[in-house]
């Protein structure tokens, strides 16, 4: 601050959250029932199609997106919808980095890849596909895969001393790795 160091903590200390922690893990294998990778036969294709369109993970979110102004600030590169009729959802956020003077062509890109149905069945498979999906979206938007940096947001039930409780975050970390 004003040329003086106020706090100087090592990165190694910050990575531990201040204390060494260990936990036992009992790994839970996903059920064979509900396996999303198994081929299923559908008798009523039209009914299944309409059912899929009503799924919150598939249906249009245009009404929600229109509540936000994507043109605020001069940094936005992609609008929320693109294409000839402005109806195609963009799969990545791209914004120029702010600079004090002059122009910049440097951007930051962000995407996502979470599949709640797959992750509910298997946190491991959900994490694998989350990484692959988010990388594919960045590359499709013009990003360089070798410069991608990851951040993972995780939401698991409260952990305690029960080793089976640690199965979900442990499996997800293995999948993301």
Residue ranges and their predicted role:
Residues 1-177:
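Glycine/proline-enriched, intrinsically flexible loops and inter-domain linkers
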